[in-house]
Amino acid sequence: MMNNQKLPSWLTIDADCALIQLSRPATCNGVVLDRLRMRAPTVRDVRTAHKTAGGDEADRELQLFASLLEVGQKDLEELKLVDYQRLQTAYFRLVEDDGGFAGAAA
């Protein structure tokens, strides 16, 4: 399904990653950052997060995002809610299939 919605000004997406501008600086891995880079997930990323979360969907998402962002889970728990919601939006936009890959083989 094609999504024609305009991206928010705080979000940049390409085929491999999303760059998320935070509403305020946050400390991740001991470094103060004003944006985070989320790489596109693999099937392995999703399966690993699902296995280690033990059925807890919120924990599964935190583990998955921590892996994709290469930050600690505790760092994500310290984000302001608005910034965590930006991560959620970025994730769903990143995995969305818009059918637009021109190099796909038939």
Stretches with model-predicted labels:
Residues 2-106:
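Short, surface-exposed, charged amphipathic helix/loop patches that serve as local interaction elements
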